[in-house]
Amino acid sequence: MLAISGLVKRYGARTVLDGLALRVEPGEVVAIVGESGTGKSTLLNLIGGLEQADAGSIRIAGTDLATLDDDARTRLRCRAIGFVFQAFHIVPHLTALENTVLPLVLQGVAAGERDARATAMLAAVGLGSRTAALPRELSGGELQRVAIARALVHGPALVLADEPTGNLDPDTAQTVLALLNNRARAGNAATVLVTHSEAAAATADRVLRLARGRLAASGATAEHGTDGR
């Protein structure tokens, strides 16, 4: 579960996030939309522990990021968070299986167990026959499936997806989004999806718009209130 309150982030004199609040329950998918430059990616970086907030709290599975030193924050990130990015971030000289297994390697999972878990996750995303394929042998949709498998293989409490379908054609994008959301829900992960795509946002349980440093309900989800919960 993700719980954020009073989050503030400044870059010099510019306040990007101003008292932002957000709560995402296990198994829930929340889409964040907004204009370019409103701080959507900054928000994900703060949640993922890649940047430090100026004020406020971020709790992931009950742990307040502000109470952790750099090493502990890295351990939490490896254990509890799965990342899916627009640019895939697939290691080019590793096979689909070797890419997928990386979070389990970082956690020190035994080789036999981690290979079995990665193989099962690749099968779950429709790549059971492509485990030995190198990235250059995979399509854009297949590469994003590898990225999803890698993000979910270690059973994270939280999945952060930053424009995960930005490089995909519309049909492939819909397939990949359905896969990401369904697998995250199956693993009971809280999911935050940042997107410019209305079609992508429509797959979420809630849609929140980031503007003037805060989140408000957007479109058909307005009945959920305006405080990000």
Task: List the model feature ranges, each with a label.
Residues M1-A211:
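ABC family nucleotide-binding domain
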Residues R212-E223:
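Conserved switch/coupling elements of ABC/ABC-like ATPase nucleotide-binding domains
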